[in-house]
Amino acid sequence: EAPEGKVRSQLTNEWIDEDLYDQRPLAVMYPINKEGMPQYGYDKIDIFYEILEEDGMSRQMAIMKDWKDLDKIGNIRSIRDYFVYAALEYDPIIVHFGGPVVYVKDILTRSDVQNINGVGGELGDSYDAFFRENPDGRASEHTAYTKSELLLKACDTAGFQLNYRDDVFADYKDKSHYQFTEASNKNTLEQYGDKAVPAESLDFSAAYPHDIPTFEYHADDHLYYRSIYGEPQKDGTTGTQLAFENVLVQWTYYEVRDDNGYLAFRMHDKTHDGMFITEGKMIHVTWEKDSDYGPTRYYDDNGDEITLNTGKTM
């Protein structure tokens, strides 16, 4: 039975306030650069992405539904078009600081895509939603931040709807983004027998050699704790380490676009491989996505959609 005034989040299946149910999330672009740490707003993350960009670096995107009470978010960095395609399935308000115009202009300036762009100009207005902080003399690209108050004013000025939009999201807004099990009934992956292999220490340095991301599973709270550069990745305000109930890995086709090293990833596809990691185990999956606003679906080797555990997903 639901606690009074609470409903299940479409993104995590956790209990949230009723007034958050229809609220559009933010999609916030965070850097991975060590010089840009610490970062702020992590505690509100529901779903977190890391995808490569040029020069072997990667970038992070946070999907956060409960975002209206944050005094500091960021630092904020530029976006790539494949992050936009990953974000659209949440009907978000996208928060970023520019991007390579030749590759992101077409998607960011589409009439259905709503973004708040710290650089302003042809990729979208800033709506005066950003500020600079630089107490330790870091490079300027690591000094741009925003906060909830400024974002709310920006949305009002821009005319961005704060609740899910019926014209693009009516088919999805009242459905769970993933298929979830209840928190009291964990999906241990034991039903897959030998196909579920142990996965308590995860090392993604081969895929992301710059920040060397790792995860350590803690059986006591069923969470995978994330580290980068050999240190816990923490929220700059609370000091809480990023941790996730579910880790999803997607493999996909990519190519190098030009001499600057800009990448392209195929974000709409069928039957590409991946991995689902939870409860200290891992199974092979395939994934598919066939529309901008439709969710990415993940299937086990029996062809059944996988069931995620209640909580945050990386």
Task: Annotate each PLM feature.
Residues 2-49, 54-314:
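A surface/extracellular/periplasmic glyco- and lipid-processing/surface-interacting theme
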